[in-house]
A protein has these predicted regions:
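Active-site-adjacent structural elements in enzyme catalytic cores
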Residues: 1-171
Length: 171
């Protein structure tokens, strides 16, 4: 579906999710009871190193810098528009990842929809393809809305954070 599998360490008393994926913590808890998250996949600082090998480095990153913008939808759209306008004025080619609900509100740059915000499966499925498409379009910088959706949103955000090298602007 675009997002890799969930990795779970079962060698401890309480199983630990080493990489969030399509199987959510709630799904696991229904089958095996309490689970915890590897602190290294939650923390953005370099002090907490993830245990899963594929989680330790900037992963599936596009060639362009990727910056996530997180917050309330209206503020996110306004901030991405301001950042995109500034980048265009500096002569940069801008990519923007929005949703079906927001793409019409971005006048600058190469704007693509990752899907409907409510369709987590589509977001997960299209994530890496969109990043590769921006490579082909040779954009200099990509601004993306955040996708903290309730079901597999944690896995989606985990992959976006890794691709962005944890560059996040909160508005």
């Amino acid at each position: 579906i675009g997002i890799e599998s969930t990795i779970v360490d079962l060698t401890e008393d309480i199983p630990m999710i080493l990489r969030p994926g399509y199987i959510t913590p709630k799904m696991l808890e229904k089958v095996i009871g309490e689970v915890k998250m590897d602190p290294g996949i939650i923390a953005s600082d370099s002090l907490q190193k993830p245990k899963a090998p594929g989680m330790k480095y900037k992963h599936y990153a596009p060639k362009a810098d990727l910056i996530l913008v997180d917050g309330e939808e209206e503020k996110v759209v306004a901030k991405i528009n301001a950042l995109a306008k500034e980048a265009v004025l500096l002569g940069k080619k801008v990519g923007i990842i929005g949703t079906d609900e927001t793409i019409d509100r971005y006048p600058e740059g190469e704007v693509v929809s990752i899907g409907a915000r409510s369709d987590e499966d589509a977001i997960a499925k299209h994530l890496y393809k969109l990043l590769r498409d921006f490579d082909e379009k040779e954009v200099d910088i990509i601004y993306s809305e955040s996708f903290a959706t309730p079901r597999i949103g944690q896995a989606i955000m985990n992959r976006l954070l890794k691709a962005a090298g944890h560059q996040v602007i909160t508005v």
